[in-house]
């Protein structure tokens, strides 16, 4: 048997406790199966009953397609937090964020503890200790920081992060017709590239834990329901649900591919990190 020493990531936000040590002792040994694990985050994806209640959007076809493939879809689920950094730092460290943390949640100031806790988290640390490779996919946004333990990093970023491009588009540079400064095109490139690369994960011989953060259907919307660039004139809500439909299509295709190509049945988790967030409203952001 191999002894797996568990270190204590999570930074100062999640210091180790006695209960942690009791749950996973340092001499813990694991010799069971190691299926590939996929943790797929769809940023800003609403719960299906909330879509229907407030916007009369029927998402039942997608939900039923998941259940037919063996997924459990949790009813009435909701995020514990209303922003990506808070939500992911909590889930990846399997703990609530301390209530006395000095963070401005409305203006997203002093988010460094959350960013560090996402990059150096307990889930990845534990899985790597028992022999998993860590595959990380994101748009390089700070809220989904990859940390120092990544074995395979999937990114289509060439010049600047999506957030940097957003800032640049607020300056005089916004008039330059460069793809690297085009937020919509960059989002499209990142997402299409990400789905393509995830299809290659089942080819890896070693067991993998894949964390994949897709900035969809989060604003700015970059896809209509057919995968094309959204047309001008549609409302934010219409654009949001069009991108939901395209996200549904891509997730279904990806799940089918992973299930077909995996020698050992994988574990696949698909979730939203928070609810719908329009630029001028935080309505239903937790659901």
Describe each region flagged by the PLM:
Residues 1-287:
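Catalytic domains that recognize anionic headgroups
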């Amino acid at each position: 048997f191999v002894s797996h020493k568990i270190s204590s990531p999570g930074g100062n936000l999640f210091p180790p406790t006695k209960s942690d040590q009791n749950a996973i002792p340092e001499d813990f040994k694991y010799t069971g199966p190691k299926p590939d694990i996929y943790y797929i985050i769809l940023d800003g994806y609403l719960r299906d009953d909330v879509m229907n209640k407030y916007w009369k959007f029927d998402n039942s076809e997608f939900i039923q397609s998941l259940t037919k493939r063996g997924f459990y879809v949790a009813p009435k689920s909701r995020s514990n937090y209303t922003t990506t950094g808070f939500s992911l730092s909590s889930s990846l460290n399997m703990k609530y964020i301390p209530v006395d943390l000095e963070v401005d949640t409305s203006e997203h100031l002093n988010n460094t503890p959350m960013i560090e806790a996402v990059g150096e988290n307990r889930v990845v640390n534990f899985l790597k200790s028992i022999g998993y490779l860590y595959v990380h996919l994101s748009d390089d946004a700070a809220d989904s920081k990859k940390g120092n333990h990544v074995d395979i990093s999937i990114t289509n970023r060439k010049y600047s992060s999506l957030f940097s491009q957003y800032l640049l588009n607020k300056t005089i540079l916004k008039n330059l017709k460069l793809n690297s400064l085009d937020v919509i095109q960059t989002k499209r490139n990142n997402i299409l590239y990400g789905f393509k690369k995830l299809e290659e994960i089942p080819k890896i011989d070693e067991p993998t834990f894949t964390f994949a953060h897709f900035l969809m259907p989060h604003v700015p919307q970059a896809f209509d329901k057919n995968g094309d660039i959204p047309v001008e004139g549609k409302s934010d809500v219409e654009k949001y649900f069009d991108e939901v439909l395209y996200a549904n299509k891509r997730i279904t295709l990806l799940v089918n591919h992973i299930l077909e190509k995996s020698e050992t049945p994988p574990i696949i988790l698909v979730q939203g990190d928070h609810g719908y967030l329009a630029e001028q409203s935080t309505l239903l952001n937790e659901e």
